[in-house]
């Protein structure tokens, strides 16, 4: 039996997703819980290995096991801190959560004070479609051509939410796009300059810096023909926890805004 699990976590409590020696990671926390529960498994895979500080509402992992207890989220949730399993689906044995994904949806949260949302929306149109995102990512050897399907921006409760959807993303790509939208909306980064950068015309020393990881949330990963059974109790528990913890991010983002604007003026 192969299962896909929807997981949420507070990324500020970990040193990233991927297991590393001597530090706490999301993958390490899940594997430890599986071991403590005595659940034997194989072929463990993840959809997205988020960076340190980045949280998730809807990341997905998959594993193969004959232990039916995996279908009860509380078996692992009771053994983990800062990670919550809230959805499960039985999937084909060759299912890979990263390669089978249609799109990923990220949300970034910013304090709305001083934000020109109308201008941010205008700037966001420049990123739609297929471009070279080397100026808006931390290059790691992968092909830098990527496609953005959708960007939506709205304000709610004194917070600006930037939602970005696409097939796949480069390292720090979403966070750097958010930085560019903020700078563009405030007149620091011209739209013409963004177009040039998306065509590969930029100085490496003048790349747009990434927004802080604490404001980024991997909201969802979409699949065809994969129906997750939702555990509402686990989902609500995560939602309560993350709202309290994200309150701190508002002050961090305000500090980031001051720093990035001053950096551009130096």
Curated annotation (Swiss-Prot):
GO terms for biological process: tRNA pseudouridine synthesis. InterPro entries: PsdUridine_synth_cat_dom_sf, PsdUridine_synth_TruA, PsdUridine_synth_TruA_a/b_dom, PsdUridine_synth_TruA_C, TruA/RsuA/RluB/E/F_N. Pfam families: PseudoU_synth_1 (PF01416). Substrate binds at residue 106. The keyword tRNA processing applies. One of its GO terms (molecular function) is RNA binding. It comes from the Archaea. The active site is at 51 (nucleophile). Keywords: Isomerase, tRNA processing. It catalyses: uridine(38/39/40) in tRNA = pseudouridine(38/39/40) in tRNA. Its EC number is 5.4.99.12. PANTHER family: PSEUDOURIDYLATE SYNTHASE (PTHR11142), TRNA PSEUDOURIDINE SYNTHASE-LIKE 1 (PTHR11142:SF0). HAMAP family: TruA. Formation of pseudouridine at positions 38, 39 and 40 in the anticodon stem and loop of transfer RNAs. Belongs to the tRNA pseudouridine synthase TruA family. This is tRNA pseudouridine synthase A. The lineage of its organism: Archaea, Methanobacteriati, Methanobacteriota, Thermococci, Thermococcales.
């Amino acid at each position: 039996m192969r299962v896909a699990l929807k997981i949420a976590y507070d990324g500020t409590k970990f040193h990233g997703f991927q297991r590393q020696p001597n530090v706490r990671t999301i993958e390490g926390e899940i594997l430890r819980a599986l071991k403590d529960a005595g659940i034997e498994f194989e072929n463990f895979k993840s959809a997205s290995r988020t960076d340190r500080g980045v949280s998730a509402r809807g990341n997905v992992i998959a594993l193969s096991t004959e232990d039916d207890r995996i279908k009860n989220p509380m078996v692992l949730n009771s053994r983990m801190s800062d990670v919550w399993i809230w959805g499960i689906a039985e999937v084909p044995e060759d299912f890979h959560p990263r390669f089978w994904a249609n799109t990923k949806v990220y949300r970034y949260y910013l304090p709305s004070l001083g934000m020109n949302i109308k201008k941010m929306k205008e700037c966001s149109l420049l990123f739609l479609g297929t471009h070279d995102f080397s100026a808006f990512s931390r290059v790691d050897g992968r092909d830098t051509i990527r496609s953005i399907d959708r960007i939506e921006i709205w304000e709610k409760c004194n917070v600006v939410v930037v939602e970005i959807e696409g097939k796949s993303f480069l390292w720090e790509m979403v966070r750097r796009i958010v930085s560019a939208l903020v700078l563009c909306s405030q007149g620091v980064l011209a739209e013409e300059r963004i177009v040039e950068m998306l065509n590969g015309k930029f100085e490496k020393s003048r790349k747009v810096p990434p927004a802080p990881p604490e404001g980024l949330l991997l909201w969802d990963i979409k699949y065809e023909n994969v129906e997750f059974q939702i555990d509402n109790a686990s989902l609500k528990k995560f939602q309560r926890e993350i709202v309290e913890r994200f309150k701190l991010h508002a002050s961090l983002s305000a500090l980031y805004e001051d720093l990035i604007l001053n950096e551009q003026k130096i």
